Amino acid sequence: MPTTQNTVSFHDGRSAPQLGMGVWQVENDIASSVVKTAIDIGYRSIDTAAIYGNETGVGRGIAESGVKREELFIATKLWNDRHGHDSTKAAFAESLEKLGLNYVDLYLIHWPVPKVDLFVQAWESMIQLRDEGSAKSIGVCNFNINHLQKLLDETGVLPVVNQIELHPRFQQAELREFHAEHDIITEAWSPLGRGRLWDEPSLNAIARKHQRSVAQVIIRWHTQLGNMVIPKSVTPSRLKENFHVFDFTLEAQDMADIAALDTPDGRDGPDPELFRLPAA
């Protein structure tokens, strides 16, 4: 299958495929087949996390794919209860073991959990993991500007990626502007808005014009903005559809029409300032 697609460049000198597959809510016992199918289709970037409970299955799919490790881009994430110098390193070692890998291409802090306020300690350990080579690049998820600024002020090191909720109903322009000013790549989770956009008239009009699905239009919007994007599906036909988005281009008016869908209260997931462990 074709694997040609766009890549993004990180400020640490590395690069990544712009389009990947997320495996949130993919059960561990089917993760291997889903990952192998995605790689067969042409995906080279897989995004998992410790809390997903499927790192073992993801690792099995990678091993069974027959694709050389250096051709793949594998990301996983540190969960909220493992922030801290030693606990972060231990959690990372556990993830590597489950994945069956000796390095990951990207290791991410999953949430800042500011009420606990240990994310800087976690970041300091991740800098060490990067310097040792077991995490080739390091990033964060769900960090607001104040969290990113704290990393910069206290460590001098900014993430290469901030993975955030981002879709046409919740476009986070101010945060994306901060990313652009500091050479941080924006990566979108929930990039399709959890299906709430399928009936949106303007998106359907754009889809008809380009003879594409609404999902393909939204994914192409992300890539034309320069975002990394990780849509999730376990259905082979949908995986194929999501992957084939680089052979058409949205026009300026299309991009403007999608920009107009933004709303101030469009968030589907938790607020990073409030999301925390139950006991925190």
Model regions and ranges:
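Beta/alpha (TIM)-barrel catalytic core signal, keyed to glycine-rich beta->alpha loops juxtaposed to Asp/Glu
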Residues: 112-280
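CE4/NodB-like, metal-dependent polysaccharide N-deacetylase domain
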Residues: 11, 88-109, 128-132, 153-154
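N-terminal binding-site loop/beta-alpha segment at the start of enzyme catalytic domains
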Residues: 1-72, 125, 278-280
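Acidic-and-aromatic substrate-binding clefts and catalytic sites of carbohydrate-active enzymes
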Residues: 26-29, 47-57, 81-86, 114-117, ...
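Short, acidic/polar
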Residues: 26-38, 84-99, 146-149, 170-171
